[in-house]
Swiss-Prot record:
Organism: Sulfurovum sp. (strain NBC37-1)
Gene assigned in the entry: atpE
Name of the protein: ATP synthase subunit c
Alphabetical list of HAMAP family matching this protein: ATP_synth_c_bact
Site features described as Reversibly protonated during proton transport, chain residue numbers: 80
Cited CDD domains: ATP-synt_Fo_c
The protein's role, per its UniProt record: F(1)F(0) ATP synthase produces ATP from ADP in the presence of a proton or sodium gradient. F-type ATPases consist of two structural domains, F(1) containing the extramembraneous catalytic core and F(0) containing the membrane proton channel, linked together by a central stalk and a peripheral stalk. During catalysis, ATP synthesis in the catalytic domain of F(1) is coupled via a rotary mechanism of the central stalk subunits to proton translocation. Key component of the F(0) channel; it plays a direct role in translocation across the membrane. A homomeric c-ring of between 10-14 subunits forms the central stalk rotor element with the F(1) delta and epsilon subunits.
Length: 101
């Protein structure tokens, strides 16, 4: 009985082998959406913490406000760069997928 079950599983894989490309496309869309959503969420949390720390530092020592703002903008650019890198990877997965022949 086990041998027949394994045979049917093997034949099922052969029967549906032509649908592999559409499954890769579907999973690429899901992966791009989830990846970009998580990257945006992480970026938003990181930017919020950066802004809160800058505001707290400026409140403690107003004389350092300019230097803190400069450092904050550099940190925000680095955080946003991570989200942009995720967007580039998602666009590659959607439009130039290396797994689709």
């Amino acid at each position: 009985m086990k041998k027949f079950f394994l045979l049917f599983l093997a034949l099922g894989a052969v029967a549906f082998a032509g649908e592999g490309e559409s499954m890769i496309k579907a999973y690429s869309v899901v992966a791009a959406g989830v990846g970009l959503g998580l990257a945006a969420l992480g970026g938003a949390v990181g930017m919020g913490h950066t802004a809160a720390a800058t505001i707290a530092g400026t409140a403690r020592n107003p004389g350092l406000g300019g230097k803190l703002m400069t450092t904050m903008f550099i940190a925000l650019a680095m955080i946003e760069a991570q989200v942009i890198y995720t967007l580039v990877i998602a666009l590659i997965a959607l439009y130039a997928n290396p797994f689709i022949g």
